Amino acid sequence: MVQSGQITFYTHMYSPYCHRVHIALEEVQADYKAVTINVMEWPQWYNTKVNPITRKIPAITYGGPAAPPEDPSPEAVKLTESMVIVEFLADLFPGKLRPSDPVQLAYARLFVALFDTKVHEAFKGFFFMGTPASDLLDQLEGIQARLPETGFAVGEFSIADVAAAPFLARIMLLLENDIGKYPVGEGKKAFEELQKPKFARLMKYIADIKARSSFRASYDHAQVLFIWQNNPAIQRA
Ligand SMILES: N[C@@H](CCC(=O)N[C@@H](CS)C(=O)NCC(=O)O)C(=O)O
């Protein structure tokens, strides 16, 4: 299959889940229109007309006749859940994002699952609840242990890296700037820990991700920093 209809991508720069879809759209070089959702004044039309299932971003509409983003055609396919959309894009653009070898594909999906469970839990714990950094660092060490000596998570760039990149970028950004509910200084301390030789492979992986054109096209460091600095959910009391 190839893209045969319009793609409207509902997103916001702060969201790591939206960022996954953005990276995938850039990787496959889809023809798409991005629509930023005002997360401070969540639009009712989004919940009723685009994503009544989870009412979360990201979402896409695919196909159907031309229509304004806030009133998509009933004929357009509506999809939500970041990795469902990423896998859909991998189907629309065969040969990209998925390794052809079934074992490597299974490993890629396992990597995604680790991010959606353990890394995400540790991310929420440290930045949103102020739990000790050790759990986050342990999870990052576990991720590092799964990486091959060189290249991306399963060699070629794949769905695994699409899933991981937004979280790794935000983890580094938040730590370096000491943003989060943990005690002052704990973020910078964890950031320094990650600069030690022990984490060299993970840091190289993150550098490779950030150098990728799909990442550069989908990430504005200053803007994401500003948004997270002002995110009320992770401000210290
Ligand atoms: N499992 C979902 C998570 C999506 C998600 O949590 N989106 C957040 C933004 S990062 C959201 O829309 N939050 C708004 C809300 O919960 O009202 C995915 O993979 O897409």
Where are these regions (language model features)?
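Eukaryotic N-terminal low-complexity, Ser/Thr- and Lys/Arg-rich leader segments
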Residues: M1-I7, A217, N230-A237
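GST-like domain detector, emphasizing the conserved glutathione-binding G-site
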Residues: M1-Q144, P148-E149
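Residues embedded in well-ordered beta-strands within globular domains across many folds
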Residues: P58-T61, A163, Y219
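Active-site-flanking alpha-helical
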Residues: A90, F167-L168, Y219
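Short, flexible loop/turn segments with low-complexity composition
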Residues: P102, A217-F226
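GST-like fold's C-terminal all-alpha helical module
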Residues: V103, L110-A211
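Acidic, serine/threonine- and proline-rich low-complexity regulatory tracts
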Residues: R201, Y205-S214, V224, Q229, ...
